Amino acid sequence: MAKELADKAKEAFVDDDFDVAVDLYSKAIDLDPNCAEFFADRAQAYIKLESFTEAVADANKAIELDPSLTKAYLRKGTACMKLEEYRTAKTALEKGASITPSESKFKKLIDECNFLITEEEKDLVQPVPSTLPSSVTAPPVSELDVTPTAKYRHEYYQKPEEVVVTVFAKGIPKQNVNIDFGEQILSVVIEVPGEDAYYLQPRLFGKIIPDKCKYEVLSTKIEICLAKADIITWASLEHGKGPAVLPKPNVSSEVSQRPAYPSSKKVKDWDKLEAEVKKQEKDEKLEGDAALNKFFREIYQNADEDMRRAMSKSFVESNGTVLSTNWQEVGTKTIESTPPDGMELKKWEI
């Protein structure tokens, strides 16, 4: 049955009926979710519809299912080039070319990527400050494009060197979460059996360093850390929603421009919405490591540079048993491990 649907999808694709092709491939995937061919072919239909982030996600899934499927690398490279993700595209195309050296399409697209990367580097005029401010007040948490059809709420906040995206999805097993990072792409896919899949696949406001990005699946949410390629303040999470600015010390949160979305509905009170989000975060009941991480993060975000250095040094040197914010106290000595009352410190030899 799945193959019959895929055959009909191919016929629709040939007839330039790409929406129907996507729908039929999706039904085939529901019946056979481990077929890499279906994902690679749906990626091609998405490319025709100019849904490039969806195409990248499908190509990544096809590669995960079958790393030797050459056309999956071709689809990923093509979609990434459309998104101006030339380095990510080049990496995918080079991998595909290594599998099938005789395929001329790869060489042609790789040459095009090299040319576009060179042109992009020529156009880079972003000034880099000689010194960075010692303390920067992080912008407030910003609510993102929440629509009535969104399955899970998500939001982000940022620091000078990273953007942290939180998806509030409770009780999701780690194996049901698939997250990919591109040069300027984030792809979050949550697939729970018996439920509609959740997709968060924005083209990001700024470029990131994929190898330094990471994520963690917690009991109440998924936390994603995006390492910024440039030390700039993102005006939003998504591309094209405002100019980038260099961070300034102690910028008032009142100056931060909040996102406005075209709508026929009553204008939202973003100050009230932000207060509600912060209250939900504050009231959120976490346990174990998740609670400790939240506590540590909240203190760290509001600390100055000396406090952050003190916290990091004391926590690391004491093996997690001491957390100090006094740099004058801990900066000149080694912090010994101090077990809680009633517990004994033991050293293990391997």
Curated annotation (Swiss-Prot):
Pfam families: CS, SGS, TPR_8. Residues 260-350 form the SGS domain. Changing residue 220 to A/R: No effect on the interaction with barley HSP90. GO terms for biological process: cellular response to auxin stimulus; cellular response to hypoxia; defense response; embryo development ending in seed dormancy; innate immune response; regulation of defense response to fungus; ubiquitin-dependent protein catabolic process. InterPro entries: CS_dom, HSP20-like_chaperone, SGS_dom, Sgt1-like, TPR-like_helical_dom_sf, TPR_rpt. One of its GO terms (molecular function) is protein-folding chaperone binding. Residues 149-238 form the CS domain. Induction: By infection with the oomycete H.parasitica (downy mildew) and heat shock. One of its GO terms (cellular component) is SCF ubiquitin ligase complex. PROSITE patterns: CS, SGS, TPR, TPR_REGION. Changing residue 168 to S/R: Diminishes the interaction with barley HSP90. Belongs to the SGT1 family. This is Protein SGT1 homolog A.
